[in-house]
């Protein structure tokens, strides 16, 4: 069959290959010598898949049509794979109906992919991309609270108070919980990677919304600056990681036999005022706002990556490198002047 990869090569399936994280994950897996299957909703959409077609020059990459709502569409891409990376998630921040636009599809997507994994006898481990939004949202008070993999976002608070954009954290939390339930019931070796806000550069033709959010203090985008403030107020901090570290963490936990459970991937914890001060000093050529009135200057909590680091992972990028690369990326995209 044409879909078979060469014998002896490790094979990975990356679900949702057109995304920010998934496309870099595909690239890094190919560079490590993996044969890679990736799924996209519409392989005929040239704008969405052009960067994946370019990655085929790096190695053995096959692109499959699959839809998270269609369980059987994952059988072919997952067949014969050692690892399955489920990175795709439905995001509609402006949704009037998060329950049906995000929450149900996210849960259904996770379960459909995992069902396909149970039928493919080759799959050794499933790695699900969760989010810090599934960990950090609670009603605790104070500053300097440390949260780790034991913490879960308070779903009752989200669904009753319905703060702005509540659908996304609710969908990530409930999808991860559904994954753990399915994994336990079906004896699947599952690991979840929990990244914070991600920045750096992207292979995708469109600029990922997370880099836009991270760069908002530099670009002066008021709407996104308010988004950052909202993030700090809801989740307790502005926590950030480089997308490459997040992707390397996915591969690290897949390959590390002793790895188990959840892994937070966070390079730096800060607040909007602290971040603005840092950016204003580092990039004086951009007019970064530094006066935030009575907005809380300190973050409420610290998201700890201690478990991942103790497992043996080391972060390549600190906050300086993350922003240096993001600034260069925005310049290259014509979104920032020199």
From Swiss-Prot:
Record key words, sorted: Flavonoid biosynthesis, NADP, Oxidoreductase
Comment on pH dependence: Optimum pH is 5.5.
Enzyme Commission number(s) from the entry: 1.3.1.112
Gene3D superfamilies linked to this entry: NAD(P)-binding Rossmann-like Domain (3.40.50.720)
Keyword match Membrane: no
Temperature dependence: Optimum temperature is 45 degrees Celsius.
Keyword Oxidoreductase in annotation: yes
InterPro entries: Epimerase_deHydtase, NAD(P)-bd_dom_sf, NAD(P)_dehydrat-like
CDD domains reported for this sequence: AR_like_SDR_e
Residues annotated as binding NADP(+): 18-21, 48, 87-90, 168
Catalytic activity from the UniProt record: a (2S,3R)-flavan-3-ol + 2 NADP(+) = an anthocyanidin with a 3-hydroxy group + 2 NADPH + 2 H(+); a (2S,3S)-flavan-3-ol + 2 NADP(+) = an anthocyanidin with a 3-hydroxy group + 2 NADPH + 2 H(+)
Ranges annotated as spanning the membrane: none
GO biological process: flavonoid biosynthetic process
PANTHER family: ANTHOCYANIDIN REDUCTASE (PTHR10366:SF288), NAD DEPENDENT EPIMERASE/DEHYDRATASE (PTHR10366)
Function in brief: Produces the terminal flavan-3-ol monomers required for the formation of proanthocyanidins or condensed tannins in leaves and flowers, as well as in the skin and seeds of developing berries. Catalyzes the double reduction of anthocyanidins, producing a mixture of (2S,3S)- and (2S,3R)-flavan-3-ols.
Additional remarks: Hyperbolic binding of NADPH and NADP(+) to the free enzyme, with a single binding site each. The most likely enzymatic mechanism is sequential ordered Bi-Uni-Uni-Bi, with NADPH binding first and NADP(+) released last.
Family: Belongs to the NAD(P)-dependent epimerase/dehydratase family. Dihydroflavonol-4-reductase subfamily.
Protein name according to UniProt: Anthocyanidin reductase ((2S)-flavan-3-ol-forming)
Organism: Vitis vinifera
């Amino acid at each position: 069959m044409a879909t078979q990869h060469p014998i002896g090569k490790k094979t990975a399936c990356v679900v949702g290959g057109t995304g920010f994280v998934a496309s870099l994950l595909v690239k890094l897996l190919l560079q490590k010598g993996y044969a890679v299957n990736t799924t996209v909703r519409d392989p005929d959409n040239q704008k969405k898949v052009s960067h994946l077609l370019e990655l085929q020059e790096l190695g053995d990459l096959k692109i499959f049509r699959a839809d998270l709502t269609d369980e059987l569409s994952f059988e072919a891409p997952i067949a014969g794979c050692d690892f399955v990376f489920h990175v795709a998630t439905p995001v509609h921040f402006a949704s009037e109906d998060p329950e049906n636009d995000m929450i149900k599809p996210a849960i259904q997507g996770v379960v459909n992919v995992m069902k396909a994994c149970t039928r493919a006898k080759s799959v050794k481990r499933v790695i699900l991309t969760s989010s810090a939004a599934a960990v950090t949202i609670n009603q605790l008070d104070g500053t300097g609270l440390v949260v780790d993999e034991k913490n879960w976002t308070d779903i009752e608070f989200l669904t009753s108070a319905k703060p702005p954009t509540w659908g996304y954290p609710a969908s990530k939390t409930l999808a991860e919980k559904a994954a753990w339930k399915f994994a336990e019931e079906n004896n699947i070796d599952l690991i979840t990677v929990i990244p914070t806000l991600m920045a750096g550069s992207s292979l995708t033709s469109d600029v990922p919304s997370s880099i836009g959010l991270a760069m908002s203090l530099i670009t002066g985008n008021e709407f996104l600056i308010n988004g950052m403030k909202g993030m700090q107020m809801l989740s307790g901090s502005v926590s950030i990681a480089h997308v490459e570290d997040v992707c390397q963490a996915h591969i690290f936990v897949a390959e590390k036999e002793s790895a188990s459970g959840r892994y937070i991937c966070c390079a730096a914890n800060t607040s909007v005022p602290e971040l603005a001060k840092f950016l204003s000093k580092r990039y004086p050529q951009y007019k970064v706002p530094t006066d935030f009135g009575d907005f809380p200057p300190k973050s409420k909590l610290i998201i700890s990556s201690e478990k991942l680091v103790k497992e043996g992972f080391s972060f390549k990028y600190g906050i300086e490198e993350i922003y240096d690369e993001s600034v260069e990326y925005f310049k290259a995209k014509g979104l920032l002047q020199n």
